[in-house]
């Protein structure tokens, strides 16, 4: 619940961009993100999400956090955690007075409490309930291998949470490089793909960069996600295209705008061989790791 910085909205902001990228203040940006976050975690209705927004505003007000707050003076422990949010929701539900008029109903409050219980105080709270405790972030790696064994909504919510931390560094602080390996993990959450796409468009203004990596292009060409993923291939300045595997050559060429003669350079599996593109320039490269880097890789992960 610590408000993240999503960069400043400007005239170049895409009208189709996620809501946080179009808001002005840091708090309004983060509350807009949290609505998408809760929608990712549970399929809340619009009325439930609007209720969550009202309750979040009440929660931040209790902690003295407003649109004019100076976040440079704040420590992670100055912000609420998920259990604080659940306590507020439960309090609103328990003290609901049917004789008064509210913007939300008692039933909606009950549904919200049930929906966020596991995340805030239940079995899944260990992933979400706590203050940001990262102190040394000059080089940071989020290991998400264990997420593959969780349910889809928990995985999507956790990846979305990591994405908010990365966006804060890329667009808020700047001069940061974020590398997202195994990008296919995000494909079950199309909202996250939109966030990544919009961050990629804005990072250059903050002297930041985004690196995307994935092994199988097939995952990105599924009809239900193709509309969202195709822009991800056109935004990067540099492309390293390796052997694409067992895929329809035309699909690959259309998605990455590769000419047939360029595809011919990488259509066979040759370790380390790739087509490098930058603007109008094309190079056939042989990528080799020097001995000292090869040692860093260790013995895990294939040969």
What are these regions (language model features)?
Residues 220-303:
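C-terminal regions of RecA-like/P-loop NTPase motor modules
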Residues 1-208, 212, 265-269, 274-280:
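P-loop NTPase motor domains
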Residues 215-218:
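C-terminal amphipathic alpha-helical interaction region
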């Amino acid at each position: 619940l610590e408000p993240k910085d999503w960069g400043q909205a400007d005239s170049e902001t895409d009208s189709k961009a996620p809501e946080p990228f179009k808001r002005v203040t840091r708090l309004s940006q983060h509350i807009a993100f949290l609505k998408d976050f809760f929608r990712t975690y549970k399929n809340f209705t619009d009325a439930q999400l609007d209720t969550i927004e009202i309750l979040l505003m009440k929660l931040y007000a209790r902690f003295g956090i407003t649109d004019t707050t100076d976040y440079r003076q704040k420590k992670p422990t100055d912000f609420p955690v998920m259990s604080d949010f659940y306590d507020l929701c439960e309090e609103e539900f328990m003290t609901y007075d049917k004789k008064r008029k509210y913007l939300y109903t008692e039933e909606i409050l009950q549904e919200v409490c049930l929906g966020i219980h596991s995340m805030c105080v239940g079995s899944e709270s260990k992933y979400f309930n706590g203050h940001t405790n990262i102190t040394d972030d000059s080089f940071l790696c989020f290991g998400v291998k264990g997420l593959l064994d969780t349910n889809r909504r928990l995985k999507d919510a956790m990846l979305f949470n990591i994405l908010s931390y990365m966006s804060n560094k890329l667009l808020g602080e700047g001069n940061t490089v974020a590398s997202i390996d195994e990008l296919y993990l995000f494909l079950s959450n199309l909202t996250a793909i939109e966030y990544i796409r919009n961050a990629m468009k804005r990072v250059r203004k903050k002297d930041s960069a985004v690196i995307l990596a994935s092994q199988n292009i097939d995952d990105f060409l599924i009809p239900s996600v193709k509309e969202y993923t195709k822009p991800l291939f056109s935004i990067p300045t540099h492309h390293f295209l390796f052997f694409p595997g067992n895929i329809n050559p035309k699909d690959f060429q259309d998605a990455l705008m590769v000419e047939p003669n360029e595809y011919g350079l990488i259509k066979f599996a040759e370790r380390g061989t790739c087509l490098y593109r930058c603007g109008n320039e094309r190079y056939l490269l042989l990528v080799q790791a020097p001995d000292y880097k090869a040692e860093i890789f260790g013995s895990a992960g294939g040969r």
